[in-house]
C-alpha cells in the first residue's frame, strides 16, 4: 500500500526511472544521463536550479530588483520566475507543462495566490509546487537553501559575498559536473558508456553515493582489524554499506 502522505515519494520508483505524477496535468520526468548530454549539461543544471531556486539562491538578483530575499517565500519566487521559462527549456523535467503560459490568480477557495492556465485546466498552488519541487530535489540530491541574515549588516555582507562568487564563477572556464562522476563510476563498476547513457539521474547519483558508503565502510573495517580504528567509537550503521541512503 502506498503512503497517503502527499509529500512522500517512493524511492524505488525513482530508482527504476519512473516519472512522478503530481496530477493529470503535471508530471516530473526523470532524464537519463544520455538525455542530459543531448540537452546540454550546463543548460540542464541551469534550468533545474532555476526551477528549484529559493529566494536565498537569488538574493543578489532580488536585491538589485529592490526585493529583500527574506520577505518572500519559495512559492512567491517561483511565481515570479515561471512565466519566463518556455516549455522548450523545461520539457526535459516537466514534460508538456508550459510554465510560461501560467498567470497569477487568487484562489476562490481560500484567497491564496495560485498559478493557472484556465484554458489548459492547469493549476499550481503551494502544495502542488512543494510536491513538484520536492520530487525534483530528491531526484538530484538537492537541498533547499533557506539561509537568513540576522541583521542588516549581515544581510549586506551575504549579498556582496554572493555577488563576488557570481563574478568569479563567470570568469571560470566551463567544466563538467558529471564527467568526473561518470569516469569514477566506470572505473569502479566497469560499466560501458552505453550502459551509463541509459542510467536515470536518480539511480546514477544513488550509485555514486553508494560507492562512497562502501569505500568508507571498507576502510573502517580494515582499520578495525589493523587496530588503527577504535570499533567502540564507530556506529554499526557506518559499517553497514547496504543501509538506506539519506
List where the protein language model places each region.
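Long, intrinsically disordered, low-complexity Ser/Thr/Pro-rich regulatory/activation regions
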Residues: 224-246
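Hydrophobic, aromatic-lined core segments that form the binding pocket/scaffold
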Residues: 76-171, 175
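An amphipathic, hydrophobic-aromatic interaction surface with interspersed Lys/Arg
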Residues: 1-72, 131-222
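Generic structural motif recognizing short loop/turn segments at the entrances and edges of beta-strands
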Residues: 16-18, 23-25, 41, 88-90, ...
Amino acid at each position: 500500500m502506498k503512503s497517503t502522505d502527499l509529500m512522500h515519494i517512493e524511492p524505488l520508483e525513482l530508482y527504476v526511472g519512473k516519472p512522478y505524477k503530481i496530477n493529470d496535468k503535471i508530471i516530473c520526468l526523470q532524464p537519463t544521463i544520455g538525455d542530459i548530454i543531448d540537452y546540454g549539461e550546463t543548460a540542464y543544471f541551469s534550468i533545474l536550479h532555476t526551477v528549484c531556486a529559493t529566494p536565498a539562491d537569488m538574493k543578489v538578483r532580488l536585491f538589485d530588483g529592490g526585493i529583500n530575499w527574506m520577505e518572500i517565500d519559495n512559492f512567491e519566487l517561483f511565481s515570479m520566475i515561471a512565466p519566463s521559462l518556455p516549455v522548450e527549456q523545461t520539457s526535459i523535467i516537466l514534460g508538456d507543462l508550459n510554465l510560461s503560459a501560467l498567470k497569477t490568480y487568487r484562489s476562490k477557495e481560500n484567497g491564496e495566490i495560485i498559478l493557472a492556465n484556465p484554458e489548459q485546466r492547469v493549476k499550481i498552488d503551494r502544495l502542488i509546487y512543494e510536491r513538484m519541487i520536492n520530487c525534483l530535489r530528491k531526484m538530484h540530491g538537492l537541498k533547499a537553501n533557506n539561509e537568513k541574515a540576522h541583521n542588516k549588516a549581515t544581510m549586506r555582507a551575504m549579498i556582496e559575498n554572493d555577488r563576488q562568487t557570481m563574478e568569479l564563477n563567470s570568469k571560470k572556464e566551463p567544466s563538467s559536473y558529471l564527467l568526473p562522476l561518470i569516469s569514477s563510476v566506470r572505473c569502479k563498476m566497469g560499466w560501458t558508456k552505453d550502459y551509463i547513457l541509459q542510467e536515470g539521474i536518480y539511480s546514477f547519483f544513488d550509485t555514486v553515493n553508494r560507492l562512497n558508503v562502501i569505500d568508507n565502510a571498507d576502510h573502517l573495517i580494515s582499520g578495525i582489524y589493523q587496530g588503527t580504528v577504535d570499533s567502540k567509537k564507530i556506529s554499526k550503521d557506518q559499517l553497514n554499506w547496504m543501509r538506506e541512503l539519506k
